[in-house]
Amino acid sequence: MTTSNNTKPEIDAPEGPAPSELEIVDITVGDGDEAQASSTVNVHYLGVSYDTGAEFDSSWSRGEPINFPLSNLIRGWQEGIPGMKVGGRRKLICPPALAYGPAGSGHPLSGQTLIFVIDLLGVK
């Protein structure tokens, strides 16, 4: 996995079974303002399927970061971003219950464990 916070990360395909709990790994620890559960965050991120390694979303691919209120995001982000500091890069592995729900929940990614690499660029 690449660790530069200025470039799109590359995620190596994981081995073994997908975790059943949220996994949080700090790749780079930031030294700026800390995200809170009530924050709006400015992030660059990459999302891939745990099972296939296929990319399903990336702000880098769109060419610009995005602002999100954490309260509007999947539970994996709501639980995995607070405590992160601006300038940091964090990997979240979100089981279905903390992503888009069990298979058949009506979202194309339901039933899947998802991996996100997130660069925190700002918080409000």
Regions found by a protein language model. Name each.
Residues 1-124:
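Cross-family detector of peptidyl-prolyl cis-trans isomerase
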